[in-house]
Amino acid sequence: MENLYTSKEEKTKITFTAIDNKNLNDITEPGFYVSASWDNNFSNLPSEIDKPSSKAFYLVVFSVGGGTYCQQIIYSFKGLIYYRAVVGFGNNFTQWRKINLS
């Protein structure tokens, strides 16, 4: 029974790819990403976290069609959540939208 549990546990783990010094417009590959340092360097962050000591976050990317349809969700280590998307071929990302949970 223990081996079965371990096998199941391995299938449910999420692997995060560490990122730094990136343009978020270029991250269109589906996956889970992490910026683990407050002072990492990025472009195209939401303005509220594009400040010194605010750039630690998780990024989740959903994408199909080689980025033709792409969604990015940022979960800031400061408790802020943002969303944006590309909604068709040749289009740019929409502006970041803050998600309020309260």
Predicted features, each with a name:
Residues 1, 100-102:
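Short intrinsically disordered terminal tails
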Residues 2-79, 87-91:
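Glycine-rich, flexible loop motifs
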